[in-house]
A protein has these predicted regions:
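Short, structured segments at the rim of ligand-binding sites
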Residues: 1-237
């Protein structure tokens, strides 16, 4: 994102993806009006709400292909996802994304796929929790380096709201197996230090029978201050 923004402001900058290097020459940087697109990862949690409960539209979302891989997994599950109004603003691809309540089916997510959607894994797990059949997310060893407790936190949160989630680990394979339930029961959830796990659990509570609370909601508020206020709406800009 920084390279794109610098180019927009007049920088003579070249990005070589083959060597993963950036070459920037002395340049005259000029100020300009900048449009900041919506964060895709945050949008995914609202979209998960739409897939489980009804129509949700997220507007002006950044849709850089390196960030949107989780949508392919959603679609493999049978999710009704539509991307509209694609355009470029300040060098960034943005669009509006619509998610509608869907009849979801279980899938297998390989460890490489899981690593590529690391930031969206809790949201993916929550929609798997109401899919038909048993889904599996394999754990890539690099995920342990990024967040050693993530899969344990996802499993605990899902069980807290009445989901059927089993953590497995052996010398040959590790991950979580999620068997879909018709509806989450609800309950109180501790998200620890993971805002994404807390956000996913909050989505589950909105579609649960009894509701519940995120006991350490301040963790979510610190990272996404508007999340709790807007949860339950059906349009986000």
């Amino acid at each position: 994102h920084m390279e794109i923004l610098l180019k927009e402001m007049g920088a003579d900058i070249t990005v070589d993806e083959a060597t993963n290097s950036v070459d920037m020459k002395e340049s005259e940087i000029k100020g300009k009006k900048i449009f900041v697109c919506g964060d895709f990862t945050e949008a995914v949690y609202y979209l998960a709400q739409g897939l489980l409960s009804g129509r949700v539209e997220c507007k002006n979302v950044g849709v850089n292909p390196t960030r949107t891989r989780v949508l392919q997994l959603f679609k493999r599950m049978g999710a009704k996802i539509k991307i509209t109004n694609r355009r470029m603003l300040c060098g960034e691809p943005i669009a509006d994304i619509v998610a509608e309540k869907s009849d979801l089916k279980a899938i297998l997510v390989t460890d490489e796929e899981a690593y590529s959607v690391f930031d969206e894994l809790p949201a993916l797990a929550i929609i798997m929790g109401m899919a038909n059949g048993e889904s599996v997310i394999a754990e890539h060893k690099a995920i342990k380096d990024l967040d050693a407790d993530l899969f344990d936190e996802i499993s605990e949160a899902m069980r807290s709201v009445g989901g059927n989630c089993r953590r497995f680990s052996s010398p040959s394979a590790a991950g979580i197996a999620i068997k879909g339930v018709e509806r989450y029961r609800g309950g109180n959830v501790k998200c620890g230090y993971s805002a994404s796990v807390g956000m996913a659990a909050a989505i589950a509570l909105t579609v649960s029978e009894e509701g519940g609370e995120i006991e350490d909601e301040y963790v979510i508020d610190a990272q996404y201050p508007q999340f709790s206020e807007t949860l339950g709406a059906n349009s986000f800009a």
